[in-house]
Amino acid sequence: MYQINLAIAGIAVGTVSLPVLSKALKNKNLKKIAAIQNKSFELSLLLSVPASFGLIFASDQIVNALFGYGTFSAIDVEMTAIALKFFGYGVPAFALIKILSNFFFARNNTRTPFYISIFIVFLNISISLSLFSKIGYIIIPIATSISTWVGVIIYLYLLNLKKSLMLD
């Protein structure tokens, strides 16, 4: 369910901004680069933050409306709603990852996003495996959200380090 928000907030914005950003970088138009990065970042957050709040605060109602019948028990609804709530905390990060990776792709740098993605996956798996026996299924959405936010921080750090991030 959180993937719908990712598709709208991250993938759509990223797909539209990548060719424009690539062209601005090729032309070394710093004002346009900054404007594209700002708009991409802002639009992504504008779409993903409200979606995140919706998933966090209305997860019970969403899951109940979609699955609260048939063989899906009340306990199943409750457990799924809790998982959705924790995925909700990661929605802005899921969208930002797509935007931030495009800042590298536009510069013909595919290695850095690849290595960051590998790190995020290993971090996610490590957190999940190390805490699954203590916390249970709920660690999976928690680990996914945490590892993705760590990825966002890494992207921002590396872009800032290379003076490639031009946000207001």
Annotate each predicted stretch with a short phrase:
Residues 1-168:
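Membrane-embedded alpha-helical bundles of multi-pass transporters/translocases
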